[in-house]
Amino acid sequence: MLAFNNDYSHGAHPAVLQALVDTNMEPQPGYGTDAHTERAKQLIREACQAPDGDGVFLVGGTQANATVIDMLLAPYEGVVAAETGHVACHEAGAIEFGGHKVLTIPGYEGKMHAEDLENYIQVFYENESYEHTVFPGAVYVSLSTEYGTLYSKAELAAIHAVCQKREIPLFVDGARLAYALAADECDITLPELAQLCDVFYIGGTKCGALCGEAVVFCGMHAPAHPIPRIKQHGALLAKGRLTGVQFEALFTDGLYFEIGRQAIETAQALRRVLHERGYQFFLETPTNQQFVILPNEDMARIREHASIEYWEKYDETHTVVRFCTSWATTQEDIDALAAVL
C-alpha cells in the first residue's frame, strides 16, 4: 500500500535512528538536562542565528501547541487564530481543555490577514464591556498552514507588527517547518523567522524524527520555570535525551534542510502527475500537501492501492482529499501512484 495520506507514516530518518542506536547505552541525566539536548539547543541557536534564544523540547505538536499557548497566556486570555488554523479545527479542543479559548478570525486559504487581526483587537478594546470577555493574549499562525500554504515575509512581518503594537506574543507552529522552508515560493529563512515572531517550534515528528518538537523562544525569554509547566501538561519526557539526540542529528550537516528538499521535490513531481491526469486542485500549494477534488468513485479506486486523506466533502459526488509527501517519499513511490491514477 502506497502511503500518501500524511507525513508521519514512517519511522525516523535513518541518520536519526542511527544516532539513537549509537547513543543508546550512554547513561545520561533525565528531563532534558543531558549533553545531547544541550548540544541540540546550541546547534539550533546557531541555525537560527539567535545566540540568546532559549528553548525546550516537547514530544509532539499537540503538546507543543497546548503547552506553549498556556505558557503565553494569563487565565483570562485566549489565543487568536485563523478559523482554519490547526488549533481551531484539528486539536480536539486541546487548547480549550487547558483553560484558554481559541478566538477565531477569517482565514484565507489557511492564512490570517494582519488587517483582520488589528481590527479584531481594536473592536475588542472599543467594547466598553471588554473586561467581561476573553482577552486576545497571543496570536497563533503556522508555517506551513493547515492548507499547505505559506506566509510571505511581508505578510508575517505585518502580523508581527500588529502583535508588537498590541504587546502580545506571536507564536508560529512549525510542525512542517522543514517543508515550508524548502518550498521554492518561501522567501523566509530560519534566521528571519526567528526575527519575525516571539516563539516558534521546529517540527520533528513530521520532519524525520520519531517524535519531538523544538520550541524556540526568540523574541522573548522563555517563561519562568518551564519544566513544571510542561509536566503539568503531561508533556515532559523523563528520557529527555530522546528528543535531544534526534534534534542533534537533524541539525548536523544540514540534515533538516535536506529532509525538506526531498519532500518538496517529490511533491512537485506528484503535482505534475495530478495535473497530467486532469484532476482539479482544491487550491494550489507550494509545499508537501496537495489538495485535489476527486470524484467519489476515483477516491474509492485509488484507496485500493494508496492511502490518501479525506479532507472535506466538496459536493454530493466529489470529495476533497489530501496527498502528502514526506522525507521518506521516493520517485518510485510517485511512479507507482501515477500508474494507479
Task: Briefly describe each language-model feature range.
Residues 13-61, 83-84, 88, 94:
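Conserved N-terminal alpha-helix of the aminotransferase class I/II PLP-enzyme fold
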Residues 71-89, 118:
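Conserved PLP-anchoring active-site segment centered on the Schiff-base-forming lysine
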Residues 74-76, 268, 272-341:
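Conserved C-terminal alpha-helix-loop-beta "cap" of PLP-dependent enzymes
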Residues 79, 102-103, 170-172, 281, ...:
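Hydrophobic beta-strand scaffold residues
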Residues 99-146, 151-158:
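PLP-dependent aminotransferase-class I/II
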Residues 109, 135-136, 142-145, 150, ...:
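Active-site C-terminal subdomain of aminotransferase-like
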Residues 151-183:
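Catalytic PLP-binding core of fold-type I/II PLP enzymes
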